[in-house]
Structure formats: C-alpha cells, structure tokens
C-alpha cells in the first residue's frame, strides 16, 4: 500500500497575493511544491486549486490538478473535497502538503505517511522537530506539542509546554535544559486515512481549537490519536510574506 499527496492551493491569498503562481527557481511556486511531492515516493500527486488559473498552470507542466470550490474556509475542507472528486478509497493514505512550501523535504513527506502505513490503527499523523532555545519555546507563533509514551500527541499549544518549573522562565537567547525528547515544535504537515479525513473536515470547531487557533485540536478533543514523526531538523519554512519569498528563492538559484 502506498500514499498520495494532495496539495491545496489558493490563488486568493491575502498577505502575498497570488503567491502560488509567483516565480521560484524559474517556475511557479506551486509547481516547485508539486515536484517535491513527486520525489517523496507518492503513488499520486494532485493539486487541489480554488481557481482555474492554478489548474491550468499545473496541467501545463504535465501535472494533475482539480478545481475545487472557492468558498472552503480551510485547506482541510479543500483536501476532503479533492479526495471525493478523485474517488479515493476509504483506507487511502493522504498527505496534506501546503501549496506555499517549496522547501519541504520529500523524505519528511514519506516518513509522515509511513507512520500510517506502519500503524493501521492510527487515523492521523503529523511531524515535529526539537526545540533547543527559549526564544522559540516562548514564541506563540511556534506551535508546541507534548508526546506520550506511544509517540502520539497529547496536546498542542502556543504556550511554552511543558513548563520546567525548576528552570523557567529563561532569558532571551538561552538554551533549554539538556533533556532530550521533551520540547517539540509542530510542523504543519499531516497525513490522514481518507475515511477519517471526511469525518474530520465535517466536524465543527472545538472549544480548544478556538482558544488556541489550532485546527488539529478538534481531533484531540474527540479522542483521536495523532501519531508524530520526530524529525532531526525542520524543512525551510513556508511562504507568507515577500520576505519569505526572497528567502525561499535563495534555495532555488
């Protein structure tokens, strides 16, 4: 059994308009993302777009793309619609790769999907990297997670968790206590089984999801075990601003 990668892509981005079609290394960003997915070993890679212009772009490079509804409020809803349009089986493993992450490493995509291939009882998987400095742990834009003994997420938060009562808070620039496997930053990469994805996308927002502004909390609050692949280092961050775009372009001279 293999996996597929679906790439939700919005042309109507707010902070950086039309970013998925902006040039990165001589081709549109969304095509760079698709090429990273193709290198992951996925059996199928499909871009799920909100506009015909994105669909036409991908098809001009010989790729597979679908036009999905424009009114989806999140990428998960777009992903679920694309899976239905493709007629994917209930047990199909789907990796959700954002259309603004041309620096994603194919190995990380494969490893996250492999968690579901190796653990048939799991319905959802994600990834994380170690946090070593206080500034990152204290940053509310860096989402933290706590793992249980089975390698599944117990909680996600923008707060610095777990809180080391003996040492915290630290000063800016300080490294965290040398306790391996304690502090983790969540990476916004997910894999799902299709039947679960369809249910998950239809669930209403949960209380903790609203408080933390973290969509994955709706799964935890319903008792879903989210398997976590612990990577050694993070891929290049996604593109939200013009400064991000300049940084990513340096990776593709």
Curated annotation (Swiss-Prot):
InterPro entries: Cytidylyl_trans, KdsB, Nucleotide-diphossugar_trans. Pathway: Nucleotide-sugar biosynthesis; CMP-3-deoxy-D-manno-octulosonate biosynthesis; CMP-3-deoxy-D-manno-octulosonate from 3-deoxy-D-manno-octulosonate and CTP: step 1/1; Bacterial outer membrane biogenesis; lipopolysaccharide biosynthesis. Keywords: Cytoplasm, Lipopolysaccharide biosynthesis, Nucleotidyltransferase, Transferase. GO terms for cellular component: cytosol. It comes from the Bacteria. CDD domains: CMP-KDO-Synthetase. Its EC number is 2.7.7.38. GO terms for biological process: CMP-keto-3-deoxy-D-manno-octulosonic acid biosynthetic process; lipopolysaccharide biosynthetic process. It catalyses: 3-deoxy-alpha-D-manno-oct-2-ulosonate + CTP = CMP-3-deoxy-beta-D-manno-octulosonate + diphosphate. It is an enzyme of class 2 (transferase). It holds the Pfam family CTP_transf_3. It is found in: Cytoplasm. One of its GO terms (molecular function) is 3-deoxy-manno-octulosonate cytidylyltransferase activity. Belongs to the KdsB family. Activates KDO (a required 8-carbon sugar) for incorporation into bacterial lipopolysaccharide in Gram-negative bacteria. This is 3-deoxy-manno-octulosonate cytidylyltransferase.
């Amino acid at each position: 059994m293999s996996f597929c990668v679906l790439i939700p892509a919005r042309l109507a981005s707010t902070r950086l308009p039309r970013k998925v079609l902006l040039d990165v290394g001589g081709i549109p960003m969304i095509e760079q993302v698709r090429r990273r997915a193709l290198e992951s070993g996925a059996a199928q890679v499909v871009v799920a777009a909100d506009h015909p212009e994105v669909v036409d772009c991908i098809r001009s490079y010989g790729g597979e793309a679908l036009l999905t509804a424009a009114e989806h409020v999140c990428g998960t809803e777009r992903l679920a619609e694309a899976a239905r349009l493709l007629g994917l089986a209930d047990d199909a493993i789907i990796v959700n790769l954002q259309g603004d992450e041309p620096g994603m490493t194919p190995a990380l995509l494969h490893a996250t999907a492999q968690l579901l291939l190796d653990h048939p009882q799991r319905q959802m998987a994600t990834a994380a990297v170690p946090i070593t400095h206080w500034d990152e742990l204290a940053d509310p834009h860096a989402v933290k997670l706590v793992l249980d003994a089975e390698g599944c997420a117990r909680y996600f938060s923008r707060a610095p968790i777990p809180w080391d009562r003996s040492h915290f808070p630290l000063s800016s620039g300080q490294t965290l206590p040398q306790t391996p496997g304690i502090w983790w930053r969540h990476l916004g990469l997910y894999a799902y089984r299709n039947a679960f994805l369809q249910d998950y996308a239809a669930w209403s927002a949960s209380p903790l999801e609203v408080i933390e502004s973290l969509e994955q909390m709706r799964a935890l609050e319903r008792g879903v075990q989210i398997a976590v692949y612990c990577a050694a280092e993070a891929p290049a961050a996604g593109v939200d601003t013009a400064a991000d775009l300049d940084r990513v372009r340096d990776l593709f001279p």
